[in-house]
Amino acid sequence: MDHLVKIIEKKYEKKEIPDFRPGDTVRVHVKVIEGDRERTQVFEGIVIAKRGSGINKTFTVRRIGSHGVGVERIFPVHSPVVEKIEVVRKGKVRRAKLYYLRNVRGKIRIKERRD
């Protein structure tokens, strides 16, 4: 049974996913359908968490929206709604989950990682 699930999941996995980690700044291109027309919306922010495995893998992106309000979105990595993921900047952090950034006020500075 487990073997059959893996075969079906393999069919829906995306191939062109860039390597990114928590702390990286990413630009996610999301397909939005409004009525009869379709457009691409860009959401740029810091990856604060990655979770799951296989086709159920998700990542959380946080950015500071208008009026200083924090906005977080959870994206499934293999979703057909996510058109493209671009890594804008690689961040150097020592945690897998950056939930502490929710409580930080002002400009968040994360050092840049040099690979």
Swiss-Prot record:
PROSITE patterns: RIBOSOMAL_L19 (PS01015). This protein is located at the 30S-50S ribosomal subunit interface and may play a role in the structure and function of the aminoacyl-tRNA binding site. This is Large ribosomal subunit protein bL19. One of its GO terms (cellular component) is cytosolic large ribosomal subunit. It comes from the Bacteria. The keyword Ribonucleoprotein applies. NCBIfam families: rplS_bact. It comes from Thermotoga maritima (strain ATCC 43589 / DSM 3109 / JCM 10099 / NBRC 100826 / MSB8). It holds the Pfam family Ribosomal_L19.
